[in-house]
Structure formats: structure tokens, C-alpha cells
């Protein structure tokens, strides 16, 4: 597909290669993928690597000339972030439908591309979707931002490290289980980023408040 072509093109034109670790952690049955978000590269890579896949993205991206039109062809789960409650309902409904059809659901829980060296707070939408579907989440860390920065057109040659973590299951149900699973996934991504990204800063967050 065109996503694989884009990755091939970046290798040929910009000298951007990649290495993947943790392939043995990929479950046989599709589940919810929670990926670090630094650049556009991982959007192409993960969409081409996990098939079939539905990516959760902000609706306004679909209106970007050419890029947005191409995204629309992938039939993403487009949410309206200006209406948080509606966005959660859209994610829950459409995400569950995709999972039942045997498709992976890709979520960037930080919500936007985060500069190299920083970690954004993980939203719980992805873990809520997984818990309600009785499926695990698959955390993924990478350092694509070193070769493909968030801002600007410049691309830098190098080898991107992609690390697929162990599938994580919730311990129980409800808000408390969702929060605990989300915290585990966020901690794993943060720890792994500290290993593969030399200037990565570990960011600690206060314990999430949970209504039991």
C-alpha cells in the first residue's frame, strides 16, 4: 500500500532505515496499539506494518490537501477533539466495531506529536477501549523524531529503533482497571524511550484520581 511505499521512499531519498525489536510480543488477535508519537513517520510505518488497521486521528487532518485525502482512504476513526465527550463516544463505538471485525486500532495516547526528549500525558481512551473489549493493549516506543522531526521539512539519515512491548491485560474491570493499565503502558513507553533516545527525559505524573 501507499504507506509502505512512503517508508521505502524515505529510505531511498532520505536514508532513513529502521530496526524492529519485540516481534515475538505481537499477539495473534488484533488489539489496541498504544504508540509513542513524535513524527509523521510512525503513522506511515505502523499503518503499513499492522494490517488491517484503523487509526484514531483528529478529524481536521482529513482536510489537509493530499495528506488528509490519503488518510481518508485508510478509513480512520476520525474524532472531533473540540467535543471531548463526543470524541470518546466515537472512539468507543467505532473502535469496538473495528476490533470485532478483526482490525488493529492504532491510538497515539499523547494526542499529538511530542518533541524529542519529552513525554506527553497518556489519555485513557485507548485503555478504556481495550478493557471494554476484553483485549490487551500493545505498547510501542520508537525514536523516529531524531530522523523525522516534528517541525520543518528537514529529514535526517539514520536508523529508527522501534520497540514493541509485551501485550498488557487489565487486572479487572471498570475505571480503576482502566487507569492502572494506562499507567503501566505509559510507564513502559517512558522507560523504553529513555533507553533508545539518548536525550529522552523521564516524566513522572501524579497518581491518577480514580472513581471506584
Regions found by a protein language model. Give the residues of each.
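A short, glycine/Asx- and small/polar-enriched loop/turn
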Residues: 27-29, 156-157
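Generic preference for hydrophobic
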Residues: 20, 33, 55-56, 162-164
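A generic structural signal for well-ordered alpha-helical segments
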Residues: 10-11, 71, 98, 130
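Catalytic core of membrane glycerolipid acyltransferases/transacylases, capturing the structured
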Residues: 4-5, 11-13, 28-84
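Glycine-rich helix-loop-beta junction characteristic of Rossmann-like nucleotide cofactor-binding loops
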Residues: 22-26
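Thr-Gly-centered strand-to-loop micro-motif
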Residues: 21, 57-58, 79-81, 109, ...
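Non-catalytic C-terminal accessory region of glycerolipid acyltransferases
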Residues: 88-212
